[in-house]
Amino acid sequence: MKPGSTESFHGQELEFYLAEGNMNTRITHRTAAVAIAGLVGSVTLALQPALAATQLTGAGSTFVYPFFSKAFYTYSQQHSDVTVNYQSIGSGGGIQQFTAKTVDFGASDVPMNADELKRAGAPVVQVPVALGGEAITYNLPVSIPGGLRLTREVVADIFLGKISRWNDAALEKLNPRAQLPNLPIVTVHRSDGSGTTYIFTDFLSNVSKEWKDKVGTGKSVQWPGSNTVGGKGNEGVAGQVRQTSGAIGYVELAYAIENKMSTAQLENKSGKWLFCTESTVKTAAATKPNVSATDFSIVDRSGDNAYPISGYTWAFVYESPTDKVRGKMVKDVLSWVTGDDAQKIAGSLNYVPLPPSVQETAKKALAEVKV
């Protein structure tokens, strides 16, 4: 992908249909799996079941949804006895459903913390399953040669509400060739509990002491500023940015590409200007080859080609599932998802295949599941 450009998933389409007021995704052999912008509510992946197949259920991260949907469809084609229904409801919702024991597995862009693990009521195994980056997307009525440039500090000041108009001197200094409009900045954030938000606010807390002290890091935070709106899921944020002139928001890269959104160049910790791409996210991950459920952040890493808003998605299962048959099926699915074949699918959807060291971490974690 060229810097600043947008691409679609070649030859892959989504078909949507409405059923009793809910938006569901029907998977065909050409389905990619990205929820398009502007869709509100949970997006549920329903793999058409084979005869007598066992349907597993999962819920959580919208960040990982494009990858999960195609990966689970592919798995079901290879294993006719299993289908997977994955509900893209946000990391916070996924953790809630998992701890309520209404799903077989959950997924979040930040591992479960001590309080959440306590609510689970039994030992939990957390497994890194995907690696990706978050693009800063914007909607302006003017073309910006080479794409909008933002320093780390300016991103924080925009979301703090300190920079409130697009022709602010700080933005004009960074983008001297652009005719930035005298237009209010509308910041767009997640309205639901979100691992995508955790990664983004972790980045902001690393680059701005004011953000860290006033707002902090979390799946859900009190967003400062008077001109800010929320969207449910990555697809909701993408939709709000697309329909609001002067808007700026953060979404997982696959959503920005599928929706042909403008993305900003960010100045990283080493002073280099970078777009969110597979290459720049891969470099960020390479600076920390060993991650765990208690040491996982890869935001704002040093390195000329290290994109500063990068992160992993984690799946979680019970260490000793009550239903050993279903537990074995979930373990097998996640083993396949973290393996080479599925990670090639991730790469085709603008994620970054898990580094070998992280694949080994996933393998060791899944070995702890007793089925």
PLM ranges: what are they?
Residues 40-50:
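C-terminal segment of classical bacterial N-terminal signal peptides
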Residues 19-20, 35, 48:
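Short, flexible coil/linker elements and helix-boundary hinge sites characteristic
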